[in-house]
């Protein structure tokens, strides 16, 4: 393999010499072939730079982009302004959906199954194929089949496209399919992204007011600033990530170069999708049209959906989640509190319009939610009789008094542990005092923000005719931004940090280090900056009402004082007075001639390099075991039926489906695997045959066709079949060999395929990619083990060993993601089966699935019940 890699690198070395001193290497995701990627250019240069070679598609794309302006002029002259606006709005929506849904689906399947790459390999699109039929491929250039003619055309066209745009030194046959597929994929990305941008710009241009008075104002100035900032973000992002990340290169192959993240990547997470769309809002400000703003919000929101469902899953699967042990300190403290205090439960937290961690047995939760419901209901029923001036005073006084109360508690707690001492002196515990503080702080936030929402809503209702729709939408955007900031803050510092846990439980802190995870990577005190933007959003929504400005100033000042004079001194006392430079600060410092590379960037860089996937190339040897005449799906059903009818007696000696040692063992106690031996006549065998595991009570007397789903409890009979169904259904194949008369193999169903329910089961051998049953095994029993419950230590030992074998134990905690068939209900049944005690799912989630806590808690409950008996 190493010699192949060296040869390939030498063959493509001449193409990459233009990179100068940058020695960039890459490797394919699955086959692990190393190569040097060719020189590529950004979208604008590729399409419009006359000094660069242009392919046919690039010429067509450039022509299509330019034609939009001529079409706009013609439609405007023929049908008028309004029709032209909606005409290009529809076009923009089409291209935006093509971007986020179309490209999203393509990248999703490429990420999971390498669909585009496998398609290119299957149809030999980038291979040298002679004019006669290739002995190792179904591809034939002389065939009269429409499908083969189609793929022959695709092959020639794709090769022509690459040759016409790449330098003469570029030998497409020397490169792996991944890089060639990526180069073709870029062409369609260019078309969609450029059309998306141009149609949006034309729609915005047609929406700009004609009056100079409406254009030259503070909104236009702010809009131009946002547009210029947006341009810088895009340019700086491309400077950092280059074409490789710009065109989603890691969905196709992985570069092994050192990644440098600076500039705009220190300002915001995913800058190309977050602050990289501020230009949308700048153009909306210039137009002063709420319809343009709504279209911009739609485009931006759809981009976030693309990020959430396409890019983020791929990044986590490829590079890992990027979370180190230090950044999880607060989360571990929360786990430790739950572990050491059985009566402790996670506090109720208000996030936006939802409540998290509601406990139906905790009265304070009902009191908090009841307060919100009573205030809202009272407002709705008495809206006409509420005096806004009195309500303003109520909101102002409530905020000020409650903030003074909260600040006093935190200040005295920091100085002398006053709040904790108060409870300890009255017979309560330290954790109990912390729980009461959690209720007080959350109630303070809920009460003040509920009153603010009520007051703002009544303000808008009473002056709705004077409210600008664009201002209303921008205000809601700021509210959404604050909600996002709160969620990101809580995600980064966990419940312990959100509720100022280091004021009350500093003895639980093992590492004196502030987190730099999540939003804290970019801002030192996000709650002081973004934590009040939603309140200023209410100022916009109420058309700059004086009372709302006063409330916004009050919120800002109280927030600033709390952070500056109470929180910061306490943090310095606990963690040490260290100056931490935020990502934004590093970027500002980086504008100087000497750029500074942050520690955070180095950590991300190391994680990315260490997490590069090194998958071995899938073997193709299994498919060669069988004659190709038996792989024709079109004649397969007829072949099976004829064979079953005419030669059943002759073939019966070669039909076998037996469980190993079934004469000795008919009851398999989990996690013991079940090994199955099968034999099938060569005339009946199909590479897509598969074996499913079923409950006997579900299949019943239907012996010819299985009418219930396998639910994932199935295995292929050959490792070369079902390529798009993951490795789990092929790794179970441990043996397969073929003779002139029959094919036989061995399949092992381990804990990744077995049921975790007591019952009687059977295996069914199915023909091809169907549910037609050819063979049925002898019924057998699967049962959960009975763990040793003599002592809590032995019970814990057996439980952890079992969960480890089932692959659902990580760091001593139950993690059902490791085995989709062993969930919370299975764990409950295992414990009940062993010790006779049933723990609730809610409790096990509350202790974060800690095996030590769960086993000892179950054993303690058993002892208590025995003593009561």
From Swiss-Prot:
GO terms for cellular component: endoplasmic reticulum membrane. Its EC number is 2.1.1.17. The keyword ATP-binding does not apply. Its main location: endoplasmic reticulum. GO terms for molecular function: phosphatidylethanolamine N-methyltransferase activity. The chain crosses the membrane at residues 56-76, 87-107, 188-208, 213-233, 259-279, 292-310, 363-383, 391-411, 440-460, 464-484, 535-555. Pfam families: PEMT. The modification N-acetylserine is found at residue 2. Keywords: Acetylation, Endoplasmic reticulum, Lipid biosynthesis, Lipid metabolism, Membrane, Methyltransferase, Phospholipid biosynthesis, Phospholipid metabolism, S-adenosyl-L-methionine, Transferase, Transmembrane, Transmembrane helix. PROSITE patterns: SAM_CHO2. It is a multi-pass membrane protein. It is an enzyme of class 2 (transferase). Pathway: Phospholipid metabolism; phosphatidylcholine biosynthesis. It is found in: Endoplasmic reticulum membrane. Residues 2-55, 108-187, 234-258, 311-362, 412-439, 485-534 are lumenal. GO terms for biological process: methylation; phosphatidylcholine biosynthetic process. The keyword Methyltransferase applies. Residues 77-86, 209-212, 280-291, 384-390, 461-463, 556-869 are cytoplasmic. InterPro entries: Phopholipid_MeTrfase (IPR007318), Phosphatid-EA_MeTrfase_fun (IPR016219). Belongs to the class VI-like SAM-binding methyltransferase superfamily. CHO2 family. Catalyzes the first step of the methylation pathway of phosphatidylcholine biosynthesis, the SAM-dependent methylation of phosphatidylethanolamine (PE) to phosphatidylmonomethylethanolamine (PMME). This is Phosphatidylethanolamine N-methyltransferase. The gene is CHO2.
């Amino acid at each position: 393999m190493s010699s192949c890699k060296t040869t390939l690198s030498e063959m493509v070395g001449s193409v990459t010499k233009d990179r100068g001193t940058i020695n960039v290497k890459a490797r394919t995701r699955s086959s692990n072939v190393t190569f040097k990627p060719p020189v590529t250019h950004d979208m604008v240069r590729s399409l419009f730079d006359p000094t660069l070679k242009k392919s046919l598609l690039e010429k067509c794309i450039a022509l299509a982009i330019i034609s939009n302006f001529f079409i706009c002029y013609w439609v405007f002259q023929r049908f008028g302004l309004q029709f032209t606006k909606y005409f290009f709005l529809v076009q923009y929506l089409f291209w935006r959906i093509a971007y986020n849904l179309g490209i999203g689906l393509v990248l999703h399947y490429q990420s999971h199954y390498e669909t585009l790459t496998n398609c290119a390999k299957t149809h030999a699109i980038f291979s040298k194929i002679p004019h006669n039929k290739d002995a190792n491929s179904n591809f034939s250039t002389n065939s009269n089949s429409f499908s083969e003619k189609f793929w022959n055309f695709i092959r020639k066209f794709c090769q022509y496209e690459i040759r016409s745009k790449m330098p003469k030194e570029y030998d497409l046959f020397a490169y792996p399919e991944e890089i060639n597929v990526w180069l073709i994929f870029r062409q369609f990305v260019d078309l969609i992204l450029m059309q998306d941008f141009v149609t949006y710009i034309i729609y915005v241009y047609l929406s700009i007011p004609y009056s100079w008075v409406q254009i030259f104002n503070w909104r236009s100035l702010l809009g131009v600033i946002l547009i210029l900032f947006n341009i810088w973000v895009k340019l700086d992002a491309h400077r950092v990530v280059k074409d490789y990340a710009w065109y989603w290169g890691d969905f196709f192959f992985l570069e092994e170069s050192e990644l440098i993240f600076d500039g705009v990547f220190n300002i915001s997470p995913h800058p190309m999708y977050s602050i990289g769309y501020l230009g949308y809002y700048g153009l909306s400000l210039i137009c002063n049209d709420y319809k343009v703003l709504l279209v911009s919000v739609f485009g931006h929101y759809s981009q976030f959906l693309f990020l959430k469902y396409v890019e983020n899953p791929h990044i986590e699967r490829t590079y890992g989640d990027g979370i180190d042990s230090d950044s999880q300190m607060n989360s571990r403290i929360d786990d430790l509190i739950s572990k050491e205090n059985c009566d402790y439960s996670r506090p109720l937290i208000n996030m936006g319009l939802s409540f998290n961690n509601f406990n139906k047995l905790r009265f304070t939760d009902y009191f908090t939610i009841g307060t919100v419901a009573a205030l809202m209901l009272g407002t709705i029923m008495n809206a006409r009789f509420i005096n806004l001036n009195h309500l303003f005073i109520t909101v102002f006084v409530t905020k000020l008094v409650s903030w003074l109360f909260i600040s006093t508690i935190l200040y005295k707690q920091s100085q002398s542990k006053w709040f904790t001492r108060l409870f300890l002196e009255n017979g309560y515990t330290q954790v109990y005092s912390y729980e009461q503080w959690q209720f007080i702080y959350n109630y303070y936030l809920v009460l003040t923000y509920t009153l603010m929402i009520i007051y703002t809503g009544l303000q808008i209702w009473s002056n709705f005719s004077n409210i600008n729709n664009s201002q209303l939408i921008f205000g809601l955007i700021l509210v959404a931004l604050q909600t996002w900031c709160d969620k990101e803050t809580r995600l980064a510092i966990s419940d312990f940090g959100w509720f100022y846990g280091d004021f009350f439980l500093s003895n639980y802190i093992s590492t004196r280090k502030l987190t730099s995870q999540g939003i804290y990577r970019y801002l030192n005190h996000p709650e002081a900056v973004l934590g009040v933007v939603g309140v200023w959003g209410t100022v916009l929504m109420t058309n700059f009402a004086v009372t709302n400005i006063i409330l916004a100033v009050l919120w800002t000042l109280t927030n600033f004082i709390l952070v500056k004079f109470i929180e910061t001194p306490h943090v310095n006392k606990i963690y040490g007075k260290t100056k931490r430079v935020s990502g934004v600060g590093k970027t500002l410092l980086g504008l100087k001639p000497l750029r500074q590379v942050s520690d955070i960037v180095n950590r991300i860089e190391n994680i990315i390099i260490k997490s590069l996937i090194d998958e071995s190339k899938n073997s193709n040897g299994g498919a060669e075991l069988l004659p190709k005449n038996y792989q024709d799906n079109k004649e397969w059903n007829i072949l099976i039926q004829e064979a079953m009818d005419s030669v059943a007696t002759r073939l019966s000696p070669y039909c076998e489906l037996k469980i190993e040692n079934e004469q000795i063992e008919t009851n398999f106690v989990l996690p013991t695997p079940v090994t199955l031996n099968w034999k099938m006549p060569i005339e009946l065998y199909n590479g897509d045959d598969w074996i499913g595991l079923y409950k006997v009570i579900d299949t019943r007397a239907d012996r010819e066709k299985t009418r219930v789903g396998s639910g994932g409890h199935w295995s292929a009979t050959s490792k070369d079949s079902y390529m798009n169904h993951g490795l789990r259904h092929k790794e179970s194949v441990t043996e397969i060999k073929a003779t002139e008369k029959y094919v036989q193999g061995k399949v092992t169903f381990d804990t990744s395929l077995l049921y975790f329910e007591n019952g009687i089961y059977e295996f069914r051998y199915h023909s091809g990619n169907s549910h037609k049953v050819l063979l049925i095994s002898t019924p057998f029993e699967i049962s959960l083990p009975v763990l040793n419950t003599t002592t809590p230590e032995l019970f814990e030992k057996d439980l952890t060993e079992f969960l480890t074998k089932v692959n659902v134990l990580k760091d001593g905690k139950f993690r059902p993601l490791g085995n989709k068939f062993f969930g919370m209900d299975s764990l409950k049944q295992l414990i009940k089966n062993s010790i006779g005690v049933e723990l609730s799912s809610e409790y096990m989630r509350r202790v974060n699935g800690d095996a030590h806590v769960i086993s000892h808690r179950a054993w303690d409950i058993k002892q208590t019940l025995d003593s009561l008996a």
